[in-house]
């Protein structure tokens, strides 16, 4: 979420900023503390910036080779990276002659070239259109796995975080409030903040007695007693058209691959369901619902 400290965390890891307190470890070695500060050039960390930060006066080849020694260039590392990133045909072009996706590929190649132990990516796909972002995202994951390089990616994109990362950490006010696999984050969020950060759940107020919690959408099993917030994902709600149904469709938003239906109960409370577009729902339709736990 915005302002939580994600980009600042990357800059601290890279060594671009010094923390006021605490310590940072890499390879079980302290690289930043009250007494130790390893400079950026000695951390073996690569960085891919949101705005690419390519050198406009250098062509692709020189941008990528910027962090390489003459020996590494002579040993073919430059050509290897150009081929790996599908940039052989662009090596003599300048950044302003490239598309946004090509520029980002060059930025990634420059970060990979020296063989860093960690690559930091600061919202690397936000300036690209949806199709290009997905395509480049897949390429980045492939390259990172191929080179066996650890990466830390900062993103606001929920789909990007869940599809790219092995471990997702959700930050709030500079603190990690949950760090787990994408599946665990999505299915078992530890708080409403986490639930909202990876989807658009329906948050229902309820009160649980003897392991059963009553909500506006029915009764569910609970591991706890007392007042609770119950999170129900829109895709867990199945709708059925019924002229005598208990719920009223207010709006249907079509996305192509699926649709989001807003509906309300007799009290006027509004909820969201997500379904395949094979059934058409219109405002005013009566429906019944079934929720999969």
Spans of model-derived segments:
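Walker A (P-loop) phosphate-binding loop of ABC-type ATPase nucleotide-binding domains
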Residues: 1-5
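ABC ATPase nucleotide-binding domain helices that frame the ATP-binding cleft
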Residues: 7-10, 106
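Helix-to-loop junction immediately C-terminal to a conserved catalytic motif
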Residues: 14
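A position-specific signal in ABC ATPase nucleotide-binding domains
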Residues: 17-18, 25, 69
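Conserved ABC transporter NBD signature motif
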Residues: 22-33
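ABC ATPase nucleotide-binding domains
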Residues: 44-46, 54, 59-193
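C-terminal boundary and immediately downstream tail of ABC-type ATPase nucleotide-binding domains
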Residues: 187-209, 231
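Non-catalytic connector elements of ABC transporters
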Residues: 212-293
């Amino acid at each position: 979420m915005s302002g939580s400290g994600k980009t600042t965390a990357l800059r601290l890891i890279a060594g671009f900023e010094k923390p006021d307190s605490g310590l940072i470890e890499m390879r079980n070695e302290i690289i930043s503390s009250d007494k130790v500060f390893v400079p950026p050039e000695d951390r073996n960390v690569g960085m891919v910036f949101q705005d690419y930060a390519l050198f406009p006066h250098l062509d692709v080849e020189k941008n990528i080779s910027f962090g390489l020694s003459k020996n590494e260039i002579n040993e073919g590392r430059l050509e290897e990276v150009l081929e790996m990133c599908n940039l052989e045909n662009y090596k003599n072009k300048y950044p302003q002659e490239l598309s946004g996706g090509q520029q980002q590929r060059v930025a990634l190649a420059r970060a990979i070239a020296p063989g860093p132990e960690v690559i930091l990516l600061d919202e690397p796909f936000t300036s690209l259109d949806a199709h290009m972002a997905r395509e480049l995202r897949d390429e980045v994951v492939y390259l990172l796995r191929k080179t066996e390089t650890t990466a830390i990616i900062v993103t606001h994109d929920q789909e990007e975080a869940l599809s790219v990362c092995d471990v997702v950490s959700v930050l709030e006010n500079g603190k990690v409030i949950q760090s787990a696999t994408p599946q665990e984050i999505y299915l078992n969020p530890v708080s409403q903040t986490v639930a909202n950060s990876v989807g658009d759940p329906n948050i229902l107020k309820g009160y649980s007695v003897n392991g059963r919690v009553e909500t506006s959408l029915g009764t569910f099993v609970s591991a706890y007693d007392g007042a609770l917030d119950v999170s129900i994902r829109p895709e867990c709600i199945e709708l059925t058209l019924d002229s005598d149904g208990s719920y009223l469709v207010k709006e249907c938003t079509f996305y192509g691959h699926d649709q989001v239906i807003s509906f309300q109960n007799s009290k006027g409370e509004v909820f969201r369901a997500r379904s395949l577009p094979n059934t058409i729902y219109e405002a005013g339709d009566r429906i019944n619902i079934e929720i999969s736990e």
